[in-house]
Design a protein with these regions (language model features):
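C-terminal accessory helical subdomains adjacent to catalytic cores in phosphodiester-
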Residues: 14-38, 42-59, 63-259
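Short beta-strand/turn micro-motifs composed of small residues
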Residues: 6-7, 89
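Extreme N-terminal starter segment of soluble prokaryotic enzymes
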Residues: 1-3
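Short acidic, Gly/Ser-rich segments with clustered Asp/Glu that frequently serve as metal-coordination loops
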Residues: 8-13
Length: 259
């Protein structure tokens, strides 16, 4: 069983449900919404570790986090039931509770720990937040590589992304009409390719190279966060979809960048 852990309860699960309906991801997963931000995730990880790095159990962590919702399916699971764990969170570097340097340090720690889906889990981060998936002009967007967002803009990015896009909300990614199924599927293919292409240029790797989220975060720090107080706009879900499949399947789904 695959465990997908989302920061929020609505948008990310809706997107994954659409991905499954479009045949871009296989069924057979359980979804758990953490319902808090990445800094809270770091805090809970550290509490459960008790000073021993890697000692915390992700299923146990989620059961504690969701203790006020006894009907959550996570309470029926044990670690032995789960073969792979993927987590999807916003970078949220505008968090006013902490200095930027503290947030960067904590994200770096989490990415060091959460780098393997078959162990503690693999963390994917959206920069600056999940709404990055909407921040595009008509697909394919040849200018996507240059889009950045100032950290100080914080939650204003949600409105910015909505106004920037020519599409109506998430309709271009969630099929409301079966007659538009092929069009929406094509939109996902474009999104996966342009997010991966931007990430690999940022990290100076090729389409064939393994690109870790840790390496991507370091490139964000070196080229955007530290010098300019900004992030290069990237969404977690398209990057996950590229990573999840082998090249033969990427070609079948229209995700491939290898020519």
């Amino acid at each position: 069983m695959i465990l997908l852990v989302f920061e929020g309860k609505k948008r990310e699960p809706e997107l994954f449900a659409a991905i499954e309906r479009l045949g871009l991801f296989k069924p057979g997963r359980i979804i758990c919404s953490f319902c808090s931000d990445i800094q809270s995730l770091h805090k809970r990880v550290k509490e459960l570790e008790g000073g021993v790095e890697g000692a915390a159990d992700m299923v146990q962590l989620l059961q504690v986090a969701r203790r006020n919702d006894p009907d959550d399916l996570i309470h029926t699971m044990t670690s032995d039931d789960i073969s792979e764990i993927y987590l999807f969170f916003d970078s949220d570097l505008h968090n006013s509770r902490y200095r930027l340097a503290e947030q960067v340090e904590r994200l770096d720690e989490l990415l060091s720990l959460l780098g393997n889906e078959q162990e503690y889990g693999k963390l994917y981060i959206s920069y600056p937040m999940i709404e990055a998936i909407c921040h595009t002009k008509e697909l394919p967007d040849a200018k996507f590589e240059g889009y950045c967002s100032l950290i100080r803009d914080g939650k204003k990015f949600k409105d910015k992304a909505s106004k920037f896009s020519p599409y109506n909300s998430l309709d271009f990614l969630i099929p409301q009409d079966e007659r538009k199924r092929d069009e929406v599927r094509s939109n996902w293919s474009h999104l996966v390719r342009q997010h991966r292409a931007k990430a690999q240029r940022l990290c100076e790797v090729s389409a064939k190279d393994h690109l870790t989220q840790k390496k991507l975060f370091q490139a964000q720090c070196d080229k955007h966060i530290t010098p300019n107080g900004e992030v290069a706009i990237l969404a977690s879900i398209p990057l996950f979809l590229y990573d999840y499949f082998k090249e033969e399947k990427r070609k079948e789904l229209g995700f491939s960048l290898e020519e």
